[in-house]
Regions:
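Conserved alpha-helical scaffold segments that buttress catalytic/binding sites
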Residues: 2-390
Length: 390
């Protein structure tokens, strides 16, 4: 077929799918033996009562695994971790290995059991019922073939009442993840706070509707979320352009970019962001792109951008969101271990997970003070009279 280079999509005689190749369906088909006689519940892969991080089978935060919704329900799981190794929607491959990067990053952290957060003295690993729900089904040849299976798995978790915590994978995952939240909680009922160096609402994707730079626009265009309830934090660099910025403002976006941080300070931005998160909605979804961090702290990401946030700035707001808001879903995306031989990004990513879980555990314990510090964490060992009056 003669192809006109000015036509998009280009015409082709080559069929996209082979209906006789059963491997395509197998990627998304659950094992029939999972429906057998096993009593539902969590499966702990540790043989011993205490196991160091570098030993055994690596799971998210060392959690036991679950394979079915019945497992989640029987155990009363409150947060279910899901890997989603999708990296087909941007130019630099590698974020498909993000979930394993995070699981393996556990070897550089304390085992978690009996090791509380130092600011709050709350241990989310023992306070919450956690599970590693394995990985979402992904066709690594097609983002479009992967969207609905990922959405279905995230919805499956949310329908049990557990919080799905998705680790990617690139940021195109935001589309199926937030769409799944809308499926369960209703369109427009879930606010999104989006930490990212980039606004991810472009309409330009080489002719493709969904890339890692477009999920926000697609979610709003299709009614899964509203612009007014999209709060963006940490954006910087050379985008959006005038047209995209105009679209965002027309749709009521509230954004807190690095120019705002430079002008008013991080504390002001943090307070505004928390105040606006879930303003007018009952539920909150947290989206963290690792490139929101300055690449000095998290170099292992696909689209690094200088002048980012520091872990010291990010961790308090993540704890507070978990403690103060009704979080129903979380995603951590754009981790690329192929461009970080130091594993520093994995360490920061694991701390991001633990800080959010700490906030959720604080809420469960009834600790919602926005400025909470455990007394013994800040008294310097000096008792109640510390610190001295200013």
């Amino acid at each position: 077929m003669t192809q006109d280079p000015g036509v998009f999509p280009p015409p082709s005689d080559f069929p996209e799918y082979n209906p006789d190749d059963m491997s395509g369906a197998a990627v998304f088909t659950k094992r029939p033996d999972l429906q057998g006689d096993r009593s539902p519940g969590l499966i702990d892969l540790r043989r011993y009562m205490f196991q160091l991080g570098m030993s055994g089978f690596q799971t998210f935060v060392g959690a036991p695994i679950a394979l079915t919704p019945a497992d989640l329900t029987a155990a009363g799981v409150e947060v279910a971790m899901i890997g989603a190794g999708l990296d087909f929607s941007y130019g630099m491959r590698g974020s498909a290995f993000g979930p394993q990067m995070v699981r393996n990053g556990e070897i550089y952290l304390p085992p978690g059991y009996g090791t509380p957060n130092q600011h709050t003295r709350v241990d989310p690993i023992t306070e919450l019922v956690l599970a590693d729900y394995g990985d979402a089904p992904v066709n690594n040849q097609s983002i479009y073939a992967s969207i609905e299976p990922i959405r279905a798995l995230v919805r499956e978790v949310a329908e049990t009442g557990a919080i799905p915590f998705i680790v990617g994978g690139d940021h195109s995952l935001m589309y199926p993840n937030v769409a799944a939240m809308a499926d369960v909680y209703g369109q427009g009922n879930v606010g999104v706070i989006h930490f990212d160096a980039h606004y991810d609402a472009t309409d330009a994707g080489l002719g493709l509707n969904l890339t890692h730079g477009a999920p926000v626009r697609r979610l709003i265009e299709q009614g899964h979320a509203s612009g007014h309830n999209f709060i963006q934090v940490g954006t910087r660099g050379w985008a959006p352009n005038d047209a995209d910025l105009g679209w965002m403002r027309d749709h009521g976006f509230r954004y807190h970019n690095m120019p705002q941080v430079d002008k008013f300070g991080w504390d002001w931005v943090m307070e505004r962001s928390i105040e606006e998160a879930a303003d007018g909605t009952e539920y909150l979804y947290i989206s963290i792109d690792m490139d929101v961090f300055d690449p000095a702290f998290a170099p292992g990401t696909g689209s690094p951008e200088p002048n980012g946030l520091t872990p010291r700035e990010m961790f308090p707001i993540l704890r507070r969101l978990g403690a103060e808001k009704n979080v129903v879903g979380v995603e951590l995306v754009e981790l690329n271990p192929l461009v970080d031989s130091t594993r520093a990004t994995a360490i920061v990513a694991n701390r991001v997970i633990r800080e959010i879980l700490t906030g959720i555990a604080m809420r469960k314990k009834g600790i919602t003070d926005p400025y909470y510090f455990a007394p013994e964490a800040i008294d310097g060992g000096q008792g109640q009279d510390w610190p001295p009056p200013q």
